[in-house]
Amino acid sequence: YEMSASLVGSEMCIRDSLKAGDAFSDFVGPLGCPSELIHEDIEELKKQKIVFIAGGVGTAPVYPQVKWLHEHGVDADVIVGAKNKDLILLEEEMKAVAGNLYITTDDGSYVRKGMGTDVLKDLYAQGKKYDKCIAIGPLIMMKFVCLLTKELGIPTVVSMNPIMVDGTGMCGACRLQVGDEIKFACVDGPEFDGHLVDFDQAMKRQQTYKTEEGRAMLAALEGETHHGGCGNCN
């Protein structure tokens, strides 16, 4: 198995302490339901024009889906966005399985400058059309992808990545508003109709543990010398 991780707070120390072959506890996954693509008829999928939009570490879960489609004779286009060149993941692997791979960076350090939405706009301006969009990445990125795809009339699936504590839906940390329903990403998701997700609420809830993350990071870096009571230096 391969794992890609975005380390937050005290988790940053994992990068320096773990070596190949080491083990760590308190890790569970995968959670929720598999991609809805596996439930669709392959012959019908072959008739569709599918585009994936991946942001940052969202490239990691996009890759196996694109690879699975490729192995079943379906070539999907992929748009990969990242803050800079150093944060582009799995480029060569993605090239081998994607119909077309489009890369963009926020700072213009690689290929082109802009967001994934800019690439999709340009593709549509060139006459490209898509029947389905699958977006995986930061919440703010998926929000703006969905605003654009709704305008363009492209059905869109998003893979939500809220904080998950117990992974069973009991803690409520991954609670989402999807249309008129309350959903829990760890059991009902992670995939939902992107045009129904309340992204503003999701982003607000994502900040729930921001202060604790900062304090944990400070404790990991400074040990017993830190105070951290006021939280101003998080």
Language model features with spans:
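Short Fe-S-cluster ligation motifs
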Residues: F184-D188, F192-N234
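Short secondary-structure transition/capping segments
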Residues: F24, A76, A125-K132, T156, ...
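A generic structural signal for secondary-structure junctions
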Residues: V8, G99, K121, K150, ...
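Single conserved hydrophobic/aromatic residue that forms the stacking wall/gate
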Residues: Y1-G9, C13-I14
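Short acidic, glycine/serine/threonine-rich loops at helix termini
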Residues: C146, G169, V197-D198
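FNR/FR-type flavoprotein reductase catalytic core
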Residues: S17-V165
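Local cysteine-cluster metal-coordination motifs and their immediate loop/turn environment
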Residues: T59-P61, L139-I140, N161-E191, T225-N234
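Glycine-rich, flexible loop/turn motifs
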Residues: M3, F27, T156, I182, ...
